């Protein structure tokens, strides 16, 4: 159910985030970009408040401060920011998911330096104001050229379930994720260069998985990783 809104002309460039024309009870109405907060009761003692909006074009500091005030009014105990980004990752593997808590940075947090979006600004401001926070980012294959990805949504939902300790119903996401994978596989089969590119991504992904195992299990796994890397290079004629 809708419980709050943030409405302000000063946040949006309407040539970028355009208003929408629709019909409501037979009459034409213009819907302007705005932020809507929804209350979702997921357990007798747990309510999620979802903040959904187009990313503002202007006045991010003021926008984030308004968001923090609403969080205080709703007595929010923990703020989770979620985002997706294009990356070099294969659709044939689990999508990379980076999760960082207020006191525990993920690899992406430690390594990244550059432009950020509104989720990062909200996360930083929430930390500064004393909220407990978690940041979640999922990577989606850039070669598909689409930001609609049911697999990413399903993985984020599972991660959120783990964080709050409540199993959230994925609905029909599993079926949509399989359809997304199937469509991506058809695309790669129709393009030899793309298929070869995905094969390289798969190898890099698998090698990173093995490198993570090395970090956990030590020398025997390291020796196996070296042997597999040498075999791959020989197969490439290098």
Protein language model regions, located:
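Catalytic cores of processing enzymes, dominated by hydrolases/peptidases
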Residues: 87-167
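Internal, conserved structured core segments that host functional sites
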Residues: 46, 54-102, 122
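A conserved C-terminal secondary-structure "cap"
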Residues: 144-238
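Hydrophobic/aromatic beta-strand patches that form the interior of the parallel beta-sheet core
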Residues: 4, 49-51, 80, 132-137
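A generic structural motif
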Residues: 2-9, 78-84, 172-173
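Short strand-loop junctions, especially beta-strand C-caps/beta-turns
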Residues: 53-56, 139-141
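N-terminal short beta-loop-beta anion/metal-coordinating cradle
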Residues: 1-55
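Acidic/glycine-enriched edge-of-secondary-structure segments
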Residues: 17-29, 83, 105-113
């Amino acid at each position: 159910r809708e419980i709050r809104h943030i409405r302000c002309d000063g946040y949006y460039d309407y040539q970028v985030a355009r208003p929408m024309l629709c019909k409501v009870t037979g009459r034409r109405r213009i819907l302007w970009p705005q932020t809507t907060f929804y209350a979702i009761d997921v357990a007798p003692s747990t309510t999620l408040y979802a903040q959904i909006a187009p990313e503002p074009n202007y006045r991010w500091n003021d926008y984030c401060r308004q968001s923090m005030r609403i969080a205080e009014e709703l007595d929010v105990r923990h703020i989770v920011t979620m985002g997706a980004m294009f990356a070099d990752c294969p659709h044939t593997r689990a999508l990379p998911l980076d999760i960082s808590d207020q006191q525990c940075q993920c690899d992406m947090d430690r390594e990244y330096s550059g432009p950020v979006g509104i989720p990062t600004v909200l996360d930083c401001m929430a930390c500064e104001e004393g909220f407990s926070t978690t940041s979640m980012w999922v990577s989606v294959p850039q070669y598909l050229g689409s930001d609609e990805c049911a697999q990413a949504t399903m993985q984020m939902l599972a991660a959120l379930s783990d964080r709050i300790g409540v199993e959230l119903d994925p609905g029909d996401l599993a079926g949509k994720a399989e359809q997304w994978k199937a469509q991506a596989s058809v695309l790669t089969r129709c393009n030899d260069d793309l298929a070869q590119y995905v094969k390289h991504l798969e190898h890099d992904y698998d090698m990173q998985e093995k490198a993570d195992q090395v970090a956990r299990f030590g020398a025997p796994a390291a020796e196996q990783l070296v042997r597999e890397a040498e075999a791959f290079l020989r197969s490439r004629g290098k």
